[in-house]
A protein has these predicted regions:
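Terminal helix/beta-alpha structural elements that buttress the NAD(P)+-binding lobe
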Residues: 1-203
Length: 203
């Protein structure tokens, strides 16, 4: 539940299933990328590029003129390419694969995975002020990197919703589950191979 200062009109073309997941994913991506000053000419690494936040993050970076390298499972690579990023697979040697894709270096990273992926970001990005984690908050202060501040607003959401209405952003819905199948939704999420958003609906 949010206050009226967090609300904006839903674009007519946006389905309610998308609207239910759009605000959190889009605002998190926008806030995170602006924290690391992602912009024109940058090479941006996004860990978890096929998830909801990563999906929006790739598209925003492309709109701003950045090149994106996106980490994802191999089954998600075609999807990540369709968003405008160059995908790479995790696993042994993935830091080397990123370096091959970005021979001039990586300027910034938004991490949606944590753990070894975050460790790799610290090795790949020279400036820790341009590394942000969405998940490993406990290590952020220790490592001297960024996390997303509480900066959601109606104004930010309205701007992002307008980009959706213009066709500049989209958020695919992988699956919907009724509330009484919330456990199934969680299992689907934990199974991986996510492309976009899983939404719980309430009749």
């Amino acid at each position: 539940v949010v206050g009226p200062d967090q609300l904006t009109a839903k674009p007519a073309a946006m389905p309610w299933t998308v609207a239910g997941g759009f605000s959190a994913a889009a605002q998190t991506a926008d806030i995170g990328l602006k924290e690391i000053k992602a912009g024109a000419g940058d090479t941006v690494l996004i860990h978890g590029a096929a998830g909801a936040v990563g999906t929006i993050g790739v598209q925003l970076c492309r709109l701003w003129g950045a090149t994106v390298i996106g980490g994802a499972r191999e089954a998600q690579h075609e999807y990540v390419r369709s968003l405008g990023a160059t995908p790479f697979a995790y696993g042994e040697g993935f830091i080397g694969r990123v370096r091959e894709l970005a021979p001039q270096g990586v300027d910034a990273c938004m991490d949606g995975i944590g753990g070894k992926a975050l460790d790799a970001a610290l090795e790949l990005v020279p400036d820790r002020n341009r590394v942000l984690t969405l998940v490993d908050h406990g290590r952020a202060a220790e490592l001297g990197i960024r996390t997303t501040p509480l900066a959601r607003s109606a104004e930010r959401l309205a701007t992002l919703a307008q980009l959706y209405a213009q066709g500049d952003l989209h958020l695919p819905i992988l699956a919907t589950f009724p509330l009484d199948r919330a456990a199934d939704a969680q299992r689907a999420y934990q199974a991986g191979n996510i492309r976009g958003k899983i939404v719980i609906t309430i009749d």
